[in-house]
């Protein structure tokens, strides 16, 4: 078989062709990823109404963009999220905020790569915030072990990349901010770094006070 010979002229041609094609393939993959990001960035719209089951309770909240805030009656992390939306309610520089859902096409989702499983998945950041100056914030609140998990590291990277992309994608009139949010010493901090890390009681310089976003 002439293809099995080490000095085969056909093997050399095929190898050369593959090498020449590799940059083209990489460019096509990059382009498809950019187009996918663009579609994801353009399609999310807050719906005028949502359906909820009996597992949810309705709360009267001033700055929530919906007429009422609907939360599950019981779930892990509810205490932390309740503290956070009460904190948002106190901020004069916020026009409105939205509590995102955790599944389904009607809610904002971001694709991320699960580094341990080597698979792709989607997550739903908890909060979308509209500031009075037009800035849009996308934040995900964490507490305890969820703040230190490898899954949160992966999500933080994806959220950083999405915010970075939105700010570079012909959106000069809109500024985007976002990151992972934790409470430390009765204060809220966020991390928008691509190299996310968290250690309880020892926040690195990548953690910024949420107050800096509201002093406008």
Which functions belong to the PLM regions below?
Residues 1-216:
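Electrostatic, structured charged patches in enzyme active sites and in nucleic-acid/phosphate-binding
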């Amino acid at each position: 078989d002439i293809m099995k010979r080490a000095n085969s002229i056909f093997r050399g041609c095929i190898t050369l062709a593959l090498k020449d094609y590799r940059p083209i393939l990489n460019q096509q993959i990059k382009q498809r990823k950019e187009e996918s990001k663009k579609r994801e960035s353009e399609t999310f719209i807050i719906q005028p109404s949502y359906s909820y089951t009996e597992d949810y309770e309705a709360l009267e909240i001033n700055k929530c963009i919906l007429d009422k805030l609907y939360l599950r009656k019981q779930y892990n992390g509810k205490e932390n999220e309740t503290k956070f939306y009460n904190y948002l309610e106190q901020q004069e520089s916020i026009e409105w905020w939205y509590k995102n859902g955790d599944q389904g096409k009607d809610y904002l989702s971001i694709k991320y790569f699960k580094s341990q499983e080597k698979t792709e998945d989607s997550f739903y950041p908890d909060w979308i915030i509209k500031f009075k100056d037009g800035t849009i914030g996308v934040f995900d609140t964490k507490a305890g072990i969820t703040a230190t998990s490898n899954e949160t590291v992966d999500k933080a990277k994806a959220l950083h990349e999405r915010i970075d992309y939105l700010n570079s994608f012909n959106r000069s009139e809109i500024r985007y901010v976002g990151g992972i949010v934790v409470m430390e010493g009765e204060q809220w901090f966020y991390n928008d770094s691509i190299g996310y890390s968290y250690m309880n009681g020892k926040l690195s310089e990548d953690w910024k006070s949420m107050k800096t976003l509201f002093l406008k």
